[in-house]
From Swiss-Prot:
Name of the protein in its database record: Dynein axonemal assembly factor 5
InterPro entries: ARM-like, ARM-type_fold, DAAF5, HEAT, HEAT_DAAF5, HEAT_type_2, TOG
Localization in the cell: Cytoplasm; Dynein axonemal particle
Keyword terms, alphabetized: Acetylation, Ciliopathy, Cilium biogenesis/degradation, Cytoplasm, Disease variant, Kartagener syndrome, Primary ciliary dyskinesia, Repeat
Subunit: Interacts with DNAI2; probably involved in outer arm dynein assembly.
Tissue specificity annotation: Expressed in nasal epithelium and lung epithelium by ciliated cells (at protein level).
Function as written in the Swiss-Prot or TrEMBL entry: Cytoplasmic protein involved in the delivery of the dynein machinery to the motile cilium. It is required for the assembly of the axonemal dynein inner and outer arms, two structures attached to the peripheral outer doublet A microtubule of the axoneme, that play a crucial role in cilium motility.
Principal subcellular localization: cytoplasm
Superkingdom in the source lineage: Eukaryota
Residues annotated with N-acetylalanine modification: 2
Annotated disease: Ciliary dyskinesia, primary, 18: A disorder characterized by abnormalities of motile cilia. Respiratory infections leading to chronic inflammation and bronchiectasis are recurrent, due to defects in the respiratory cilia; reduced fertility is often observed in male patients due to abnormalities of sperm tails. Half of the patients exhibit randomization of left-right body asymmetry and situs inversus, due to dysfunction of monocilia at the embryonic node. Primary ciliary dyskinesia associated with situs inversus is referred to as Kartagener syndrome.
Length: 855
């Protein structure tokens, strides 16, 4: 029956074809001998027939003429090959697809095959239920079928329009195929189909958007690229409303790890901005996508995006030339303060951004605070690009921009903060400082924050000097207010505050002289409150920079210039200070760092110290102040006594400051304060600032309190007290009242039993000085009983286990031997036999015999 059908087909040509040529008849007869094998029951038989057909079509011969091939192809081969697409044998189906490919390529009118080819392809690729697997089980064959569909699109072009339903049904399924190569080929086919049938495709293009958006996130990057490019063509030649459906997916691909994918997004979006029919209505949605690519990490992507964006701007500029006539004819030059290393966008690009900024900003500002890090980073990178285009037109959106920057500058991601500081710099560059300062400073006045200070610093850094200079004093005054500069002791806050001062100094240079006091006040606060050493060092460097722009040699010269007003402000509340008061910390910094200028400010400094160091004040505060006072007293000539005026305040220091704090009170804190006071007294007496007479005055006032401190638990206090007494005795010589002099040595003798050898050695040294004072006294006989008692006690210690102590005691005894040598000899001989070693006693006796008695 099959042979009969073939014979009838050969004998009765189609009426539309007319009489066949001899080549066609010959080909028909050749094929008629092979076609019956396609109906064989056995798989090998059908396969042999298909192989024979393949050889017949591939070999040169009658089939080489497309016109001669068209008739037999359409009547004999096509129907049977399409039936073979459902053959149970995979090999037969593969050969059938290959033969269909050959036939389409050789046929003179391949479009004639579409009415039968497209439904057959759709049946094999789609099936009746889209959710189920396609009828064609072999993925390589599905790939071949999609390639065949693509070939039909290439060969037939617009002739596919009547068969779009079948083609789209096949593509909707193949775009979701499990096999990556099928998806990729389907994307190419969809793009080609859209381009081939633009007049009809737009009515059904939306049906492909869903499958394409599922494919756009495929794990293979080449599939993702193909899906993006296919989406570009489908929307370009289809329904532009689908842009809304793909925007979020395209935005997500901007985060793709593969640069080729990001490049595809830039290319497609740029193409839409140039060629999409209703592109004007989508500008505000597409511009952010393309501009985001300007910050891509790969140079090639950045260059492509920049080139496309410039083309978009120039095209729009040309299309709206009449509207832009004035701006084109009278275009102002590039602003002189335009950011360096930035190329100014063409007018069309700037106008596009400006006109769409009100629609772009709300979504962008929302995304900058998104919970996803990548979204925040990308959005923050886009904002400075928009501001660079908007220039001074950003003024009308400034409130929204600044509010966003305040929030975004608190981000933990450094990249977000970096982009936001760049945005703030551009605000300073293009917006009048009168406008942005009003908004920023009012916000800081209500709620001071580290992020607000960072925005202010960045804006000032971007502002031209001549624009910022009139506002310099107002800014510095506001920063110096306690509600801002003392709002937080957090190092980040203080670092941002420092950035504000650095910005003013770096931008305004010598103009900072009008606000030098306020800026120094802020820097002083930063140094006082900073917890990190590095931050204090930076603040110190900024002080040096401020001094340089003011034309003075160092920050100490700055202090000399402003120390009066600084101390007047800081000490205004000194009666209310505690250990944690910012003013106390500021006062401490001024005293410690002002150097010689401190000597000019004693009328402020000493009364403040007197009031704050009373026993009724906060103990921790007193400890801090004593520490600072000790430090400056050690360098008194270069600090507190630089003008030689400190001795005139000596009575206040000794009677009103040191004496009350040397009094004994119970508790560890009180003991620590006594130690601090003793240290301060030691610094005072050893500073070489006081004359001998002044030291004697100090001795007269404080010796009783110092003697009591020899009993302190603190080894350091006992040691320093010994040294102070030694200094007092050396200065007074024999001028000390005998009664007072006699009261000293018993306290020193007690220290020879101290647990600390250092204290014992210091006590021994002081006893040497005491004996020298006795030598210098007029009535030595008055001291005989005291000296005799001293001899006895010293001879006990001469047998000490510690050799160093023995040596020290021997020196004391030698020093005192000249007073009453006979008495000393008797006392020595009385105990020599009790000593573990008579060596030291013998040395002492030899010394007494060799040295004459003191007259």
């Amino acid at each position: 029956m099959a042979a009969l059908g073939v014979a009838e087909a050969v004998a009765a040509p189609h009426p539309a074809e007319g009489a066949e040529t001899a080549e066609a008849v010959e080909l028909s007869r050749a094929l008629s001998r092979l076609l019956p094998g396609l109906e064989a029951d056995s798989k090998p038989g059908r396969r042999r027939a298909l192989e024979a057909l393949r050889r017949a079509l591939e070999e040169p011969g009658p089939a080489a003429d497309p016109t001669a091939f068209q008739g037999p192809w359409a009547r004999l081969l096509l129907p049977r090959l399409l039936r073979c697409l459902s053959d149970p044998a995979e090999g037969c189906r593969a050969l059938a697809v290959h033969l269909l490919d050959l036939g389409l390529r050789r046929a003179a009118r391949p479009r004639d095959a579409l009415p039968r080819l497209l439904p057959a392809l759709a049946a094999r690729l789609a099936g009746p239920v889209p959710a189920r697997r396609p009828p064609e089980a072999c993925e390589e064959l599905r790939l071949a079928l999609v390639q065949l569909l693509g070939l039909a699109v290439d060969l037939c072009g617009a002739a596919l329009a009547p068969h779009l339903d079948d083609a789209l049904r096949a593509l909707r399924c193949s775009l979701l195929d499990p096999f990556a190569a099928v998806r990729r080929e389907s994307c190419s086919c969809a793009a080609a189909l859209a381009q081939a049938t633009p007049d009809h495709f737009h009515m059904q293009s939306e049906s492909l958007i869903g499958p394409l958006m599922q494919t756009i996130s495929h794990q293979h990057w080449k599939v993702r690229v193909a899906a993006i490019e296919a989406t570009g063509a489908v929307i370009h030649f289809g329904n532009g409303k689908s842009v809304d459906d793909v925007l979020s997916h395209f935005a997500q691909r901007l985060f793709d790890d593969v640069p080729q994918v990001r490049r595809a997004v830039a290319s497609v979006v740029g193409g839409w901005l140039l060629c999409l029919r209703d592109r004007y209505s989508f500008f505000h949605k597409l511009i952010p996508l393309l501009l985001s690519s300007l910050n891509d990490e790969v140079p090639e992507v950045r260059q492509l995006a920049a080139s496309l964006w410039e083309d978009v701007g120039l095209q729009w500029q040309k299309e709206n030339e009449e509207d832009l006539k004035d701006k084109l004819d009278f275009a102002p030059p590039t602003p002189p303060h335009y950011p360096p290393h930035e190329r100014r966008p063409v007018l069309g690009c700037r106008e596009l951004v400006f006109r769409n900024l009100s629609k772009i900003l709300p979504a962008l500002c929302h995304d900058i605070t998104d919970w996803v890090v990548g979204t925040r980073v990308k959005s923050a990178q886009l904002l400075p690009v928009l501001l660079l285009h908007a220039e001074d037109h950003a003024t009308q959106h400034l409130e929204v921009v600044l509010r966003t920057l305040f929030q975004a500058c608190t981000d933990e991601e450094a990249a977000v903060v970096q982009s936001c500081t760049r945005s703030a710099e551009l605000v300073g560059t293009f917006v009048s400082p009168e406008v942005f300062l009003k908004l920023i400073l009012s916000t800081l006045k209500k709620t001071p924050s580290a992020s607000g200070l960072l925005v202010l610093a960045s804006a000032m850094r971007g502002c031209p000097r001549e624009a910022l200079q009139p506002h310099l004093a107002a800014i510095a005054t506001e920063l110096a207010q306690a509600h801002i500069c003392q709002a937080s002791e957090n190092d980040l806050y203080l670092e941002r505050l420092l950035l504000c001062v650095q910005a003013l100094v770096s931008v305004c240079h010598e103009d900072c002289g009008v606000a030098s006091l306020q800026l120094l006040d802020v820097l002083l606060t930063i140094v006082a409150l900073a917890g990190a050493t590095g931050l204090r060092d930076k603040a110190q460097e900024t002080m040096d920079s401020l001094a340089m722009v003011e034309g003075v040699s160092s920050c100490q010269d700055l202090y000399r210039k402003h120390i009066g007003p600084l101390l007047e402000r800081v000490t205004a509340s000194h009666l209310d200070w505690t250990a944690h008061s910012p003013e106390l910390l500021q006062f401490s910094v001024i005293v410690a760092q002002s150097g010689p200028a401190l000597g000019e400010a004693l009328p402020h400094v000493v009364p403040t110290l007197r009031a704050c160091l009373q026993p009724s004040q906060d103990p921790q505060m007193r400890l801090k102040l004593f520490s600072i006072l000790s430090t400056v007293l050690l360098r008194a000539t270069d600090t507190i006594n630089s003008q030689g005026q400190f001795p005139s305040y000596l009575e206040t220091v000794t009677k009103d400051i040191l004496a009350p704090n040397l009094q004994w009170h119970a508790g560890r804190t009180a003991a620590a304060i006594r130690t601090a006071a003793v240290s301060c007294l030691w610094a005072l007496t050893s500073s070489e600032v006081l004359s001998a007479e002044q030291i004697r005055d100090v001795q007269e006032t404080l010796m009783p309190q110092v003697l009591t401190t020899l009993e302190e638990d603190s080894k350091m206090t006992r040691l320093i007290s010994c040294r102070i007494i030694n200094t007092f005795l050396k200065t007074s010589g024999g001028m000390t009242d005998p009664e007072k002099l006699i009261r000293i040595y018993p306290e020193l003798l007690k220290r020879l039993d101290d647990v600390s050898n250092d204290v014992r050695m210091a006590a021994a040294s002081t006893l040497v000085t005491w004996l020298q004072c006795v030598k210098g006294a007029n009535a030595k006989s008055y001291y005989q009983s005291s000296v005799q008692y001293l001899y006895r006690e010293l001879l006990v210690h001469l047998d000490d286990p510690e050799r160093a102590i023995q040596d020290a005691i021997l020196e004391v005894l030698k020093e005192g031997s000249g007073l009453f040598p006979d008495l000393l000899v008797r006392e020595t001989e009385a105990v020599i036999h009790k000593h573990r070693s008579a060596t030291y006693c013998e040395q002492l006796l030899q010394h007494v015999q060799a040295v004459p008695a003191t007259q």
